[in-house]
C-alpha cells in the first residue's frame, strides 16, 4: 500500500479539489499530493527553558522529512512550566496540561488524517501527553526529546533548579546568606533544556527510550548541543521508514515494553511521576498494568545510578558515560530487560544495545556495576494500608531511615503546609499530611517541591515524613509518600486524619497506616462531607469532574461510558 494510506482521503480525487486548493496555499505542489503527510507536533515555547530550544529541532525535523520524501506539517502544542508555577495556584494546571497536550496532538493528527507523527517535548508533561496521543492515534509515531539543561555552577558546586528550591529553606534556617541565595538563583539554570537531574523530564525521556518509542541514546542529550538537532533529523528518517512499513505504536507499546520502562526508571533512580504517567500511557494503550506490577519490578531491579536529586551527578554527565543505553545493557545482561521487544526502528532492543559492554566504564562513578548497586532494590515503593487502600508511591532513595512513626501535622493545602514549615511549625519526628491536593480535590495533583525542599533546607529530610494525595516533583527526595488513593476529595482515609494521630510510614513493610481503630475511623467518616468543588468551570472544573484515581494514572478518559464496560 502507498505511504499516504491515511492522508489520501483528503488529497485524492475530484471531490477533494477544495482540500487541495487549501493545501497549495501552505506549500503543496502537484507532486506532493502523493507523499505521506507527517505531523510535527512542536512544543516550542519561551515560557520555560525546557522548551525554548525545541523550535530549532522541529525545523530540522521538517527539513529531514522533506529530504526523505514526506510532506511535514508543523503545528504547535502547549506547555506549562512546573518549575515556574511550583508552589502557586498555577501548579494546578500542570497535570491538566498533560491531558490537553494529548488531546491537541490527537486532534490535529486525527483531524488532518496524518500518516505519521513526530512529537517533540521538553517540560515534564510534554512527554506523557505526547505519548498518550501517539497511542490514541496509533499511526507510525516517534518522540523526540528537547534535551536536558547543563548544570549551573556557583562556588565550585554543580547546580540544578532544585538547588534554588532548597536554598530557600537554607536561607530561612539561617544557613545561607542573602548574597548566596541570589548567587544560586542567578546560576542554577544556565541555558536551554529540561531540569538537569534525573527529574521527571529526563526520567520520562529515558523510559520512552526503553520502550522503543525514541531513538537509542537520545534521552539524555543536552538541548544546546548539535547532537539534539541531529537526533531530530535521524528520528525523521526512522519515522519515514516506520510509515513505509506501517510500524505503529500498538506493536511497540506492549506489556513487556512497560516492564522495560519501569526497570530502567528504577535503575536510574527516577521520578515518582513516572509511575503516574506510565500508568496513564498504559491505560491509553489498553495495556493492563497496575501498581502491583510496579512493586514487583522494584523488588528485582536495583538503583544503579548516582544521579540528582538524591545523588551527586546531573544528566549531562550521565550521558557522557553511556547514558540510558549503558544502563539498559547492564539490565539486559542480568535478564531484567526484554531484549526481544520491537522498537520504532524495526529492530529489537537487544539488536540496538547488544554491542555495548555489559559492565559500566571503570573510570567513572555515575553508573554502578550490578553487583555493587547504590541500593539493592528500586526506590519507588508501593505502599498500602488503611491510609491508602488503593495504594501510594513512596520515594525511598537518599534517606537514612525507611520507617517513621509520629504525630500527624494536618494541612488542607500546600500553602498552609509551606507556611508552617518556614515558621518552624514542623519538628523532627512529625508526619506532615497535605490533603485535598489530589486529581479531583486540588484539582490537578500539585507537586510538593516547595514544602519538601523547605524541609530538606532546614535539615529535617531524614526526620520528617510527608504524605499527600498530590504529587512530588522529580526533584524531590526524603521520606515522602504521594499519590495516596483514594484521595481526600473521594473520602479516602487521608481525609479523616486528625491533628496528632500517629501515622506510620514503613517502606520495608510497604505500609502506610494511621494508628486509629476502625470504629473511630467510621465515626469520623459518618461526619465527613464532600467539599464544595474549588472550580466549577473551565479546564480545572472539567479535569476535576473527569479525573480517575492516581492509581489509574489520573487520566480523564478512563470511565467515560461505564454503563457499556
Swiss-Prot record:
Positions of the catalytic residues: 473
Enzyme class, UniProt record, top EC level: lyase
InterPro entries: DHAD_IlvD/Edd, Dihydro-acid_dehy_C, DihydroxyA_deHydtase, DiOHA_6PGluconate_deHydtase_CS, ILV_EDD_C, ILV_EDD_N, IlvD/EDD_N
Residues engaged in binding [2Fe-2S] cluster: 50, 123, 195
Note on cofactor: Binds 1 [2Fe-2S] cluster per subunit. This cluster acts as a Lewis acid cofactor.
Domain of life: Bacteria
Enzyme Commission no: 4.2.1.9
Pfam families referenced in this protein's UniProt entry, alphabetically: ILV_EDD_C, ILVD_EDD_N
GO BP annotations listed: isoleucine biosynthetic process; L-valine biosynthetic process
One Gene Ontology MF term: dihydroxy-acid dehydratase activity
Pathway involvement of the protein, from the record: Amino-acid biosynthesis; L-isoleucine biosynthesis; L-isoleucine from 2-oxobutanoate: step 3/4; Amino-acid biosynthesis; L-valine biosynthesis; L-valine from pyruvate: step 3/4
Record-annotated membrane-spanning stretches: none
Residues found modified as N6-carboxylysine: 125
Reaction(s) catalysed (UniProt annotation): (2R)-2,3-dihydroxy-3-methylbutanoate = 3-methyl-2-oxobutanoate + H2O; (2R,3R)-2,3-dihydroxy-3-methylpentanoate = (S)-3-methyl-2-oxopentanoate + H2O
Binding-site list for Mg(2+): 82, 124-125, 447
Keyword terms, alphabetized: 2Fe-2S, Amino-acid biosynthesis, Branched-chain amino acid biosynthesis, Iron, Iron-sulfur, Lyase, Magnesium, Metal-binding
Cofactor: [2Fe-2S] cluster; Mg(2+)
Role of this protein: Functions in the biosynthesis of branched-chain amino acids. Catalyzes the dehydration of (2R,3R)-2,3-dihydroxy-3-methylpentanoate (2,3-dihydroxy-3-methylvalerate) into 2-oxo-3-methylpentanoate (2-oxo-3-methylvalerate) and of (2R)-2,3-dihydroxy-3-methylbutanoate (2,3-dihydroxyisovalerate) into 2-oxo-3-methylbutanoate (2-oxoisovalerate), the penultimate precursor to L-isoleucine and L-valine, respectively.
Family that this chain belongs to: Belongs to the IlvD/Edd family.
Subunit structure: Homodimer.
Protein name: Dihydroxy-acid dehydratase
Organism: Halorhodospira halophila (strain DSM 244 / SL1) (Ectothiorhodospira halophila (strain DSM 244 / SL1))
Gene: ilvD
Amino acid at each position: 500500500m502507498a505511504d499516504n494510506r491515511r492522508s489520501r482521503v483528503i488529497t485524492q480525487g475530484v471531490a477533494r479539489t477544495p482540500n487541495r486548493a487549501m493545501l497549495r496555499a501552505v506549500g503543496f505542489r502537484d507532486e506532493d499530493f502523493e507523499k505521506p503527510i507527517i505531523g510535527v507536533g512542536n512544543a516550542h515555547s519561551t515560557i520555560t527553558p525546557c522548551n525554548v530550544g525545541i523550535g530549532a529541532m522541529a525545523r530540522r525535523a521538517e527539513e529531514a522529512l522533506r529530504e526523505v520524501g514526506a510532506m511535514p506539517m508543523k503545528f504547535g502544542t502547549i506547555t506549562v512550566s512546573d518549575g515556574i508555577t511550583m508552589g502557586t495556584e498555577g501548579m494546578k494546571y500542570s497535570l491538566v496540561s498533560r491531558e490537553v497536550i494529548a488531546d491537541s496532538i490527537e486532534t490535529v493528527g486525527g483531524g488532518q488524517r496524518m500518516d505519521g507523527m513526530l512529537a517533540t517535548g521538553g517540560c515534564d508533561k510534554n512527554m506523557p501527553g505526547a505519548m498518550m496521543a501517539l497511542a490514541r492515534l496509533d499511526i507510525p509515531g516517534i518522540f523526540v526529546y528537547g534535551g536536558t539543561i547543563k548544570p549551573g555552577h556557583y562556588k565550585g558546586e554543580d547546580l540544578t533548579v532544585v538547588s534554588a528550591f532548597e536554598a530557600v529553606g537554607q536561607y530561612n534556617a539561617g544557613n545561607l546568606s542573602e548574597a548566596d541565595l541570589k548567587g544560586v538563583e542567578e546560576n542554577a539554570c544556565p541555558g536551554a533544556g529540561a531540569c538537569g537531574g534525573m527529574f521527571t523530564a529526563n526520567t520520562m525521556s529515558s523510559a520512552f527510550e526503553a520502550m522503543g518509542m525514541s531513538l537509542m541514546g537520545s534521552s539524555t542529550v543536552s538541548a544546546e548541543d548539535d547532537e539534539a538537532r541531529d537526533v531530530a533529523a535521524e528520528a525523521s528518517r526512522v519515522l519515514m521508514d516506520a510509515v513505509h512499513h506501517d510500524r505503529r505504536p500498538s506493536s511497540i507499546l506492549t506489556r513487556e515494553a512497560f516492564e522495560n520502562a519501569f526497570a530502567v526508571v528504577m535503575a536510574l533512580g527516577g521520578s515518582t511521576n513516572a509511575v503516574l504517567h506510565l500508568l496513564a500511557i498504559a491505560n491509553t494503550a489498553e495495556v493492563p498494568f497496575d501498581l502491583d506490577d510496579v512493586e514487583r519490578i522494584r523488588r528485582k531491579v536495583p538503583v544503579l545510578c548516582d544521579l540528582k536529586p538524591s545523588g551527586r551527578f546531573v544528566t549531562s554527565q550521565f550521558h557522557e558515560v553511556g547514558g540510558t543505553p549503558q544502563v539498559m545493557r547492564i539490565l539486559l545482561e542480568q535478564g531484567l530487560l526484554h531484549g526481544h521487544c520491537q522498537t520504532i526502528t524495526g529492530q529489537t532492543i537487544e539488536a540496538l544495545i547488544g554491542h555495548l559492554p555489559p559492565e559500566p566504564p571503570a573510570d567513572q562513578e555515575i553508573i554502578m556495576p550490578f553487583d555493587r548497586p547504590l541500593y539493592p532494590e528500586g526506590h519507588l515503593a508501593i505502599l498500602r494500608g488503611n491510609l491508602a487502600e488503593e495504594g501510594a508511591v513512596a520515594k525511598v532513595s537518599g534517606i537514612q531511615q525507611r520507617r517513621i512513626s509520629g504525630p500527624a501535622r494536618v494541612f488542607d493545602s500546600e500553602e498552609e503546609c509551606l507556611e508552617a514549615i518556614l515558621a518552624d511549625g514542623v519538628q523532627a519526628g512529625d508526619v506532615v499530611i497535605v490533603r485535598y491536593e489530589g486529581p479531583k480535590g486540588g484539582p490537578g495533583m500539585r507537586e510538593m517541591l516547595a514544602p519538601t525542599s523547605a524541609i530538606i533546607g532546614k535539615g529535617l529530610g531524614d526526620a520528617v515524613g510527608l504524605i499527600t494525595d498530590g504529587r512530588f516533583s522529580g526533584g524531590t527526595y526524603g521520606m515522602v509518600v504521594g499519590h495516596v488513593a483514594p484521595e481526600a476529595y473521594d473520602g479516602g482515609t487521608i481525609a479523616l486524619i486528625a491533628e496528632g494521630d500517629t501515622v506510620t510510614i514503613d517502606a520495608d513493610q510497604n505500609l502506610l497506616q494511621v494508628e486509629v481503630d476502625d470504629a473511630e475511623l467510621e465515626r469520623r467518616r459518618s461526619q465527613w462531607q464532600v467539599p464544595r468543588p474549588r472550580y466549577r468551570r473551565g479546564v480545572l472544573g472539567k479535569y476535576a469532574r473527569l479525573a480517575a484515581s492516581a492509581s489509574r494514572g489520573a487520566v480523564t478518559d478512563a470511565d467515560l461510558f461505564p454503563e457499556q464496560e
